[in-house]
Amino acid sequence: MRVAIAVLLVAVAAAGERLHVDHYFTYEEMTQALKDLAKAHPDLARVESVGKSLEGRDLWAFTIANPKTGPEAEKAAMYIDGNIHGNEIQGSEICLYTIDMLLNEHGKDPYLTRLVDERVFYIIPCVNPDGRVAFMREPNSPHSSRGNRRPVDDDNDGLVDEDGPDDLDGDGAIRMMRVRDPEGDYKTSPTDPRMIVPREKFEKGEWRLYGSEGLDNDGDGEINEDPPGGIDLNRTFPSNWGPKSEQAGTGPYPLSEPETRAVAEWMVAHPNIASAQSYHNNGDLILRPPMIYDDDRVPREDLETYDAIAKRGKQLLPDYDYRQVFRGLYPVRGGEIDWTYTGLGVFSFTNEIWDLKQDVNGDGKQDEADWLAWNDTVLHGAWWKDWTPFDHPTLGKVEIGGWSKWALRIPPAWMLADVCHRNATFTLFHADAMARVEIGEAKVTVEGTTRRVRVALHNAGFLPTVSGQAEQAKIGAPDIATIEGTGLRVIAAGRVDADGIRVTPVLYRPARVEVPTVKGLSTVWLEWVVAGTGDAVVTFRSQRGGAARKVVRLQ
C-alpha cells in the first residue's frame, strides 16, 4: 500500500515545476525522476549510468554544470552521494532535493544561480540500489538490509544466506522475538511494560531475547546466523582497508564490489572533484575523516578548514554533533570519506541523518522510552507493535513485537522537507567554499628589450586550491601558471616571496610555473621576464580550483 501511494505522488514535469520529495522513492521512481529532471533542463544537466549493481541495476550519476560559463573540467566540482547502506535511504531523497533545487531555482535565486554557474555538481543519489530495493520491498528491521546483495557464508557451513530472519507473523516487518525464561538475561522494564531491560546479576530473569524473529532454517540449532548478503560497501574503499579479521562486513579485497568500484573509477575520472559529501543515517552527526587514526597525522591547515565548514554546519543543523570518525564514533577501515580525503585529497564529510534527541517523557534521560512516547503521541503508535504470542516450531511459545523497519533511523515522510533542505544547504555552503582561481593585477615593467611581468594569482574561495593532504601525499596535478604569446620568449620566472621583494627563481621551464597551492582567500604573485611585445596571455589552471586567463599588454 505504501508503494502504491508513493507512485501516485511522483510529479516531475517541465522545467520550473518542482519535484515533490514528500515520500521515499522506489528505485524505479528515482530513475524516472532523474531522467525527467535531465530532460527538463538539457542546458544544465545530464544523467548517465556509471555502472551496474550486483543485481544489474544502473548506478545513476547526475551532473549539473553550465557550459555557458566555462568548460566543466575547468570548474571545481562537488561530489555528493547517498544510500551506500541499503537501509539508510533518506540520503537519496536529499540528493534528489538538491538536484531539483539547483536546477529549478537557477535564474531565480541569485545564490543558487551563482553556484550552478561557477561550480559543477556530480551526484550519485543511490550507491546501493539493490540494498534500497531489498529494504523497501522485503520485510526488514530498521537495521537491515545494510550491505549489497552478494551471497556470503556467514556461518562457514558451505551454504550462503540459508538462515536469515523470517517474517513469522506476516506483518511486513522483522521485529524482535522473546521467550519467557527465568534464567534469561532480561526483565520487563518497570517504567514501560513494552520495553525489556537487562536484569541485575542478583535478579531473577524473565525473558530470553532471540533478536530478530526467525526460524532455524538449516537445522543447525541456531537462528538467523546466515542472513541474506552482503558486503558493507562502506568498508571496501582502498584507503586503510582491512580484511574480515579486522572488521566485519568487508569484502575480499578493496573495491571488490561492482557498486563501489564503479563509483571510485568514476570519481578518479573526474579530477576536478574538490569536495565530497556522503549521506547516511542516523544520529544527527557531521562526521569527517580520518576514520582509522587520530588527527596528529592530519595537516593543521586541513583541520582548521574542516572545523570552519562544520561550524557553519552546526548553524544550519543545530541538533547535529560534529565529530572526527576515529575518535568520536568508532574506527572504520575502507570507508568512503577516508579514501576521498586521504586517497584523493579532497575535503569530505558524512552526515548521519536524523535522530530524536528529545526527552519526550520528561524523565531526564534520552532512551527507548522517549521513542515510544514520541511514537505514541506523534505517530499514533504506527511504528510499534505490542508483544504478541506466537507458536514457534522449535522454541514453542514465543512473543513477537517491537519496531517496524521504518522506525528509529528514518524520519517520517512529512519531515523530509526540513531534513532535505537543511542538509542540502550545508553541502551547498561547502560547495560555495571550494577554491575559485582568478588572475588579478598584472604589472609590466619595461627593462630595455625585456619586460618584467608580475601577476597576482588569487583564490576567491575559502578552501585552498590544493589541500594539505594532497600536497603532503603528492595527490593530483599541481596548479600551473603559464605565459605565452606570438613571438614571445620566456627568459626567466620566479615566485614572489611574501615580502613582495625577493623572487625565488624557477629553474626549469620558466614559461610553465608550478604553484604548490593558493590558500583560501589569498593571493600568490609570480614574475616572468620575457622578450617580446604585443599581448601575452597568462593562464592559471588549478585541477580543483578552476581556471582563469588574462590578456596582458606588454607595451
Name what the model sees in each region.
Residues 91-137:
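Short helix-loop-beta-strand segments that form the rim/entrance of peptidase-like active sites
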